[in-house]
């Protein structure tokens, strides 16, 4: 999903950076407030960031100028909400661009928009919707992570199609081509990420029940927080 350094036209790179900036600024405020009011959450924040960094560094070759990999953003979005995940995702993408040559600085805005903004919001939206319908927690976690991953690649396909429309069929033709190529690797990766996120969440339920209760992850059917609901 990481679009390579220098691959996007300058105007596109700037536009995606401008579009991403307000979300990241808002996320910094949310993260600062979270750490100030709940300093005990720093360990879980670090774990969420590390989960994203490790998973998104496992890249497979895909469309020219990009690659396929898990994103790892669904977990952090479920735990701390999408604004904070925008910051954790941006830090992840920046370090990967500088240390791993994965992505790039000129394409940072585009990569942030797809992986650190749209992915977490889409995944969190599905997670919250399923929770409202009283779907078991681990099922909602799976679909939240699955959608966060898959929606990231949908946005990347849009970004590439906007930058490089097909000479004959234009934007829609390019979108279909980019999306279909990504789908070959990304759908299995999204399923795998969903299952892995469920495993991690089960471990967190066993080790950090109090923190998950405070964050609102452990809820009863009536909306009250409770720990035993996760056993389903």
From Swiss-Prot:
Gene3D superfamilies assigned: 1.10.1760.20
Compartmental location: Cell membrane
Citing just one GO molecular function, the answer is: cobalt ion transmembrane transporter activity
Listed GO CC annotations? ATP-binding cassette (ABC) transporter complex
Bilayer topology: Multi-pass membrane protein
Q: Does the keyword Ion transport apply?
A: yes
Assigned keywords, A-Z: Cell membrane, Cobalamin biosynthesis, Cobalt, Cobalt transport, Ion transport, Membrane, Transmembrane, Transmembrane helix, Transport
Q: Main localization of the protein?
A: membrane
Q: Which InterPro entries match?
A: CbiM, CbiM/NikMN
The residues that cross the membrane are: 6-26, 43-63, 84-104, 107-127, 135-155, 181-201
Keyword Cell membrane among UniProt keywords: yes
Pathway membership, UniProt: Cofactor biosynthesis; adenosylcobalamin biosynthesis
GO terms, biological process:
cobalamin biosynthetic process
Quaternary assembly: Forms an energy-coupling factor (ECF) transporter complex composed of an ATP-binding protein (A component, CbiO), a transmembrane protein (T component, CbiQ) and 2 possible substrate-capture proteins (S components, CbiM and CbiN) of unknown stoichimetry.
**What protein family is recorded?**
Belongs to the CbiM family.
The record ties this protein, via PANTHER family, to: COBALT TRANSPORT PROTEIN CBIM, PTHR43627
Record function comment: Part of the energy-coupling factor (ECF) transporter complex CbiMNOQ involved in cobalt import.
Protein name as it appears in the record? Cobalt transport protein CbiM
Q: Identify the coding gene.
A: cbiM
